[in-house]
Amino acid sequence: MWLMCTQKTGLSAKGLQRELGLGSYKTAWLMLQKLRDAMVRVGREKLTGTVEVDETYIGGQESRVGGRELVGKSLVAIAVELEGKKVGRIRLRHVPDASGQSLVGFIEDSVATGAEVHTDDWNGYNRVGQAGYRHRVTPVLGDPKRALKHFPHVHLVASLLKRWLGATHQGRVTGKHLQRYLDEYAFRFNRRRSEHVGKLFHRLLEQLVLRQAKTYLEITRAK
């Protein structure tokens, strides 16, 4: 756990196997998955204030057919709490599609009611206002340059996330287990300003004590 928490970019199962001299890759992988499971605190506070929300694809190029259609790729919804012009806390979720049910459901689970939610004009966000949020819509008309201009914070997080997945895990994260890696990234990102390298370790230790670890079968059978 100390190795995982104190290495700035995280630790792959292969790296942990090498560091601890483990004979089995599966043992190292399972240890890390159990730690990732504990990185989401039960009852954690929701994002507040102004929150940018968008989605990004992990694992390939976006299909140009049918808008935000998924073709063998993983779609990740991103919510970024703004602190003035800076990025605050984030939330990430692997969603099955870009429907209103998936996207508004993500917002409801991640953002406090009454907050200002800033999205583009994708119809999956049409019900955000009805869900109790102040909904600000900026049309991007499918133009990546406009999207980057009007949603710089969420695009920064998406870029950093992809870089981290590629550097630490060589992009070898399957959709089935992607959420745990997203949880790890959010856990690290939201504590990036800590002056003490051991803060992640102590926070994770606290959360591990409060929950029961999953078995190998529970982890591998998870969807």
Task: Give the label of every model feature segment.
Residues 1-223:
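Residue-level recognition of single "structural anchor" positions
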